[in-house]
Amino acid sequence: KCNPKGFTNEGCRGIDKKHWNSQCRTSQSYVRALTMDSRKKIG
């Protein structure tokens, strides 16, 4: 089953686990950066 965000609570899923794991880490880091940036702007 596909996850629109490219990752799940259990971890990344894909045909190529190495590829998807790399994409997942990149996405999560990007989301964290946006979240921190948003908090700085709000607070």
Swiss-Prot record:
PROSITE patterns the UniProt entry points to: NGF_1 (PS00248), NGF_2 (PS50270)
Annotated InterPro entries: Cystine-knot_cytokine, Nerve_growth_factor-like, Nerve_growth_factor-rel, Nerve_growth_factor_CS
GO MF annotation list: growth factor activity; nerve growth factor receptor binding
Subcellular location: Secreted
GO biological process: cell surface receptor protein tyrosine kinase signaling pathway; modulation of chemical synaptic transmission; negative regulation of neuron apoptotic process; nerve development; nerve growth factor signaling pathway; neuron projection morphogenesis
Protein's UniProt name: Neurotrophic factor BDNF
The organism's place on the tree of life at top rank: Eukaryota
